[in-house]
Amino acid sequence: MDTEYEQVNKPWNELYKEATLGNKLTVNVGMEDVEVPLLPSNFLTKVRVSLSGGYITVRRVRIKIIPLVSRKAGVSGKLYLRDISDTTGRKLHCTELLDLGKEIRLTMQHLDFSVSARSDVPIVFGFEDLVSPYLEGRELFSVSLRWQFGLSAQCYSLPPAKWKVMYQEDALKALKPSKIKKASKTDSSV
């Protein structure tokens, strides 16, 4: 299977401008990671898979966001995926407001649609409601995005899935002190 990733720099919807503020996207292509710069506006990532026929479903979506600024900077935003197979740019999935000053890893089992293998997979990835004290062009975070393709002879849809948080920096730090206290109490009673 020959997989090609390309970046297209043209507005898909003049009413909506994506603000990614000069960040980088790392896309896994086979065994190699390819780094693609995210532009301040009109960022559109498309995937083309060269196959003889059939339908593609995107499965096991994994996203890791690593901050490149101070935690106290107050950088936040919502991560979304959009379907641009029609002109409305229907929002497929959107997270809650994320604190982008802390590392976070998200996963989703699948996207709930399939498309012809002869066309581009119509997924737009980006951030909205992005709040940052920095000027445009400053790298705020790096994003790594990985997924697998599910192939089928027939077109079908899957039940809706939600983002799950695999890892969140502060959540793990909050658990560590309580585990240490419990361990020390049991040790002293022995």
UniProtKB/Swiss-Prot annotation:
**What does UniProt give as GO cellular component?**
host cell membrane; membrane; viral capsid
Name the keywords, alphabetized. Answer: Host membrane, Membrane, RNA-binding, Transport, Viral movement protein
Question: Which GO BP terms sit in this record?
Answer: transport of virus in host, cell to cell
Predominant location of this chain?
host cell
**Any one Gene Ontology molecular-function term assigned to this protein's record:** RNA binding
Subcellular compartments: Host membrane
Q: What does this protein do?
A: Transports viral genome to neighboring plant cells directly through plasmosdesmata, without any budding. The movement protein allows efficient cell to cell propagation, by bypassing the host cell wall barrier.
Q: What family classification does the UniProt entry report for this protein?
A: Belongs to the tombusvirus/aureusvirus movement protein p22 family.
Put simply, this protein is called: Movement protein
